[in-house]
UniProtKB/Swiss-Prot annotation:
Cited InterPro entries: FBPtase_class3, Metallo-depent_PP-like
Source species of the chain: Fusobacterium nucleatum subsp. nucleatum (strain ATCC 25586 / DSM 15643 / BCRC 10681 / CIP 101130 / JCM 8532 / KCTC 2640 / LMG 13131 / VPI 4355)
Keywords associated with the record: Carbohydrate metabolism, Hydrolase, Manganese
Enzyme class: hydrolase
Full protein name: Fructose-1,6-bisphosphatase class 3
CDD domains reported in the protein's UniProt record: MPP_superfamily
Single annotated GO MF: fructose 1,6-bisphosphate 1-phosphatase activity
Taxonomic superkingdom: Bacteria
Keyword Nucleotide-binding in annotation: no
Amino acid sequence: MNTEIKYLELLSKTFKNIAETSTEIINLQAIMNLPKGTEHFMTDIHGEYEAFNHVLRNGSGTIRNKIEEAYGNKLTENEKKELASIIYYPKEKVELMQNKDNFNIDRWMITIIYRLIEVCKVVCSKYTRSKVRKAMTKDFEYILQELLYEKKELANKKEYFDSIVDTIISIDRGKEFIIAICNLIQRLNIDHLHIVGDIYDRGPFPHLIMDTLAEYSNLDIQWGNHDILWIGAALGNKACIANVIRICCRYNNNDILEEAYGINLLPFATFAMKYYGDDPCKRFRAKEGVDSDLIAQMHKAMSIIQFKVEGLYSERNPELEMSSRESLKHINYEKGTINLNGVEYPLNDTNFPTVNPENPLELLEEEAELLDKLQASFLGSEKLQKHMQLLFAKGGMYLKYNSNLLFHACIPMEPNGEFSELFVEDGYYKGKALMDKIDNIVRQAYYDRKNVEVNKKHRDFIWYLWAGRLSPLFGKDVMKTFERYFIDDKTTHKEIKNPYHKLINDEKVCDKIFEEFGLNPRTSHIINGHIPVKVKEGESPVKANGKLLIIDGGFSRAYQSTTGIAGYTLTYNSYGMKLASHLKFISKEAAIKDGTDMISSHIIVETKSKRMKVKDTDIGKSIQTQINDLKKLLKAYRIGLIKSN
């Protein structure tokens, strides 16, 4: 009781009397009855900034829905298309129209402003005026409020309304106002953004994606396997650093390292030329961009360094059971073959100038110095560390949100449907306990990052999360990087998916996972990414009778020939859940000039029989707790237990 009174006394410092407390209760109770805000789910972006940015701007088709709601048949299809294009790219679209010959730009702007106001009214209708005001550009806050909340239809308001718009145009602020109202529409169209892993990978602009995400307040991120790789690199894990650089070389993306994050690759390039200058490096030509001998040499040089470091990490962490990644130890350097599980395979490349056959995992002094310098660069990159800070502040292994369970790849399972056990640090963990333990270890590694000698085990474990058999982020038995480079026999390349990926077609398995995480099996969904959905082969993103959704459909251009589409995204609003299937993104220029969009179709996953309100959400539960506390404070004021100020 004393604790409760102390809490109420603390609360009374904010709500100082009966009037203030009552007002807050009324306000919160009103919010509870507003429609639930729209959640937007995206995954496996893989550095494809332009496509990601476009999907954010169009809200996976929800902007078009708002235009339809505002105008129905009052506008032609081309007019709706133009309006959508303006909302997505207001600055660029206005500038395009301004450069048209013999075009009345003022009249066009007036028409567009009126249309945007109607769309904005629809978007704002599910929010309080306070929330809408906070989302407004300060320069136009008062004008926007007047235009949004005044009724133009009233005779005594029409002239007032029209004069505001006319003045905006006459003082040459039309472009800025259109940008402001379009930004407001975009900002309020999506109430909460979920990124279900893999911001990083082969695409060229993950840093721009991170910059964009930093602008979102209502955001969460579930770490993907490529994200954890960059986290490990940023924390000084040398195996992760080697993998990151190798992948950047593979896809000709060294600009990410050098230009975006300020990591100096010149000493590494010099090293690669010294040892591989006369090597054609046929298996190491860049997959994208201009073919370059130097990039191929760097690619091979870092691959060999990676195989050495991974072997050393495996040796010093035998409990991780990663000995299969000690590949260089299994090579017969005289015969040019490798022994895998008792079978001898010829190598397609036997030039290993930096490998000592007597001690193949030993780093050359130059390699060790190079890794030390690269480690210092990753640890010292201000922008990289800032981006990793965002991944820790907003991210984690999984999230429970509004009866949905979000995680990137899998919960490791056995073929019989039981959760797999993994020995981590001090014991065996499985299911939810494993996810929580991993989250804790990664955070401990982050807090110890400034002293690379502290808790090496924590930092080493991050490499296991990238490539380990029971890693919830990897979801396969083994990563066959060496085999794919050096062995032509493709049977050695096969990576077997964790049983989870087959078992999730069974509703009972999904129910088991819901129960493990304390969720109601009747109302919950699992939302995953990681495994591209092969739509052109008839595969569906909806599994287990709608209980599980896989929304990786191929943002990455490299996967689009396999999937047949350019990705899935998911929206969850007050009416239910809807999957959007995306066409390949042509270009930002085409979207601006021709109104080209990415949405090809929608799949209704779930329709609510009764429209969901804020009170039906996790935020609603939190607000209800606040209301209950305020009612206690109100009672305390009325009976004199706490003095009213």
